[in-house]
């Protein structure tokens, strides 16, 4: 039953708006019709949206002051947006929430910076150790006899039997 009453009320308001607009349109000097129609539409929408919302919110909420304040702030922010302003009205609670969020984000960033700094220090220490191992040290004169295997080269007099062991020998094979 309440819905039918609400529907009748809405229809009567729309009829009232239409009759008002028709009387305005009959006046040929009226050049601001679109603006007036927009304002009336916004006001009607706000009226229809805010009153039931406020009733429900006040019935279900234990803290009606906060609900009323939030609804008023929301309505004012909507009107400011419609007027073209980018600024918004914020409640004190919202400012505190935003500050807490900013502080939390700053703490997270500081922890991240601390971790990255620690990793960078560890990487620098590792690079220093690698560099120290790769550093070229001069040892002075290098003994090249080991490189070309000249220590095992013997002359004919140094061989034990006096024969060259690398000369081919006559080999016989069994058939």
From Swiss-Prot:
GO biological process, one term: monoatomic ion transmembrane transport
Segments on the Cytoplasmic face: 52-175
Subcellular location field: Host rough endoplasmic reticulum membrane; Host membrane, Host caveola; Secreted
Annotated coiled-coil segments of the chain: none
Modifications after synthesis and translation: The N-glycosyl content is primarily Man(9)GlcNAc, with a small amount of Man(8)GlcNAc.
Membrane topology, record value: Single-pass type III membrane protein
Record-level Gene Ontology MF annotations: channel activity; metal ion binding; toxin activity
Disulfide cross-links: none
Sugar-modified residues: 8, 18
Database matches in InterPro entries: Rotavirus_NSP4 (IPR002107)
Keyword Zinc on entry: no
UniProt similarity note: Belongs to the rotavirus NSP4 family.
Designated name of the protein: Non-structural glycoprotein 4
Organism: Rotavirus A (strain RVA/Human/Japan/S2/1980/G2P1B[4]) (RV-A)
Taxonomic classification: Viruses, Riboviria, Orthornavirae, Duplornaviricota, Resentoviricetes
